[in-house]
Amino acid sequence: RDWARYGNQDHNSLHTKYVDFKEVEHIINQFKRPEIIDNVKFFKTMANGMVDPHSDNRSVAINIPIRTNDKQSTIFYESLGDYDNPNINVGDKKIITKAKRYNKVNETQRFILNQPACLNTSLPHGVENLSESDRVVLSISFKDEYDSFSRINNLYRSKQLI
């Protein structure tokens, strides 16, 4: 499968690639209800690159570090209003998306993804990679009514997720 690109240029874009469930069976099998998983993707941020502040089509993700280091940050923001809808580029095809890219933001939180994390992806967020190596994470999305940060968080806290 090809890598898709959210954005116009390699270094300030998020590169994504779907993963076959069989390839990550050992991870999916740790979930008590793997049937609630919608898809699993690799996300790549280029060396010395960034992913601009954006929100996803989905509301929640569990991101697992695959190749990361302490010069790569996940950043959350508050929107100051202005946003647009970026295209997804797959090869020479453009796909319209409901995701938003924010033009005016204030940073509210920054952390290094060195362990799995549950993210509220409906909030503006991005990535800064100040290292010489690409950053790669495995990102898990959830189906239908499970595409909810509070629902996944509650399942985790009540030991019903993993």
What is each residue range found by the language model?
Residues 6, 18, 75-77, 83, ...:
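Sequence-level detector for tyrosine residue identity
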Residues 1-57:
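Signature of the catalytic double-stranded beta-helix
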Residues 21, 31, 42-43, 76, ...:
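Phenylalanine-focused residue identity feature
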Residues 23-25, 30, 35, 78, ...:
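Glutamate identity and glutamate-enriched acidic tracts
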Residues 35-116:
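Catalytic core of non-heme Fe(II) oxygenases with the double-stranded beta-helix
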Residues 87-162:
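Catalytic core of Fe(II)/2-oxoglutarate
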Residues 7-10, 19-25, 81, 115, ...:
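Generic alpha-helical secondary structure signal
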